[in-house]
Amino acid sequence: MVGKGKPLLHRRSTLKLSTNLVVDSLQDVANPAKVIEDLGFESLYISERKHDPFMQLAVAATATDRIKLGPEIALAFPRNPMVLAYSSWDLQQATNGRFVLGLGTQVKAHNERRFGLKWESPGPKLREYILAIRAIWDCFQNGSELNFHGEFFNFNLMTPMFNPGPLAVGPPPIFVGAVNPWNCRMSGEVADGFHCHGFHTARTLRENVINNIEDGLQESGRSRSDFTITAPVMAV
């Protein structure tokens, strides 16, 4: 049990803990976020359930100074990559570099029946989605020409009036939340981190998640030290 006001983790600890905040109202975000930060957690993630996670994260950003903040996960396909690129850029600036963009596909039923979207090649589409966001961010940060063309998305217009410009802290990292081996491998290729599903075993993490992520990292010329994996633990 953690005493009131006592940090959960020693500041020099190599173990990094994150937690997930679920609330019924936006008014319930600020105080818990501050308490979680004061307890020593490294990261606070907010799921996309009853409320827009980016609105909740904006509230959490105003109440905290150190803790990393991000959605775990935000649904990619209901949002255009350009729209999400702007939202993430603003949160990265508002948090002074503490924002982590977590993305996922959700399942077919939610995409088709809750959001009215066409369900098409979710894995490859998410991969292209991430590459599109990175191209947009490169335009924001480095002034490069926006000229992205893919199977699902095309972006080739960015004038100075609509370019927010570079951030001193740089673009935020992108994490993926997924289950199947293809998406795990894809995450290792194009993402910076991975959110494991809440229901897992040591075997599934090793064989289904980590092995495939490492294959993807090898494809991208990176090592395991370049990548972050978060694995939730349920206490009963």
What label would you give each PLM region?
Residues 54-55, 78-79, 109-110, 205:
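Short secondary-structure boundary/hinge segments and terminal tails
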Residues 45, 68, 100-102, 195:
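Conserved beta-strand positions in the central sheet of alpha/beta enzyme cores
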Residues 2-71, 77, 172:
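N-terminal beta1-alpha1-beta2 module of alpha/beta enzyme domains
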Residues 74-79, 118:
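Glycine-rich "substrate-gating" loop/helix at the edge of Rossmann-like oxidoreductase active sites
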Residues 12-15, 88, 92-193, 200-227:
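Internal, glycine-rich beta/alpha segment that forms the wall or movable "lid"
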Residues 81-89:
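Catalytic cores of alpha/beta
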Residues 22-24, 49, 74-76, 104-108, ...:
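Active-site beta-loop-alpha junctions enriched in small/polar residues
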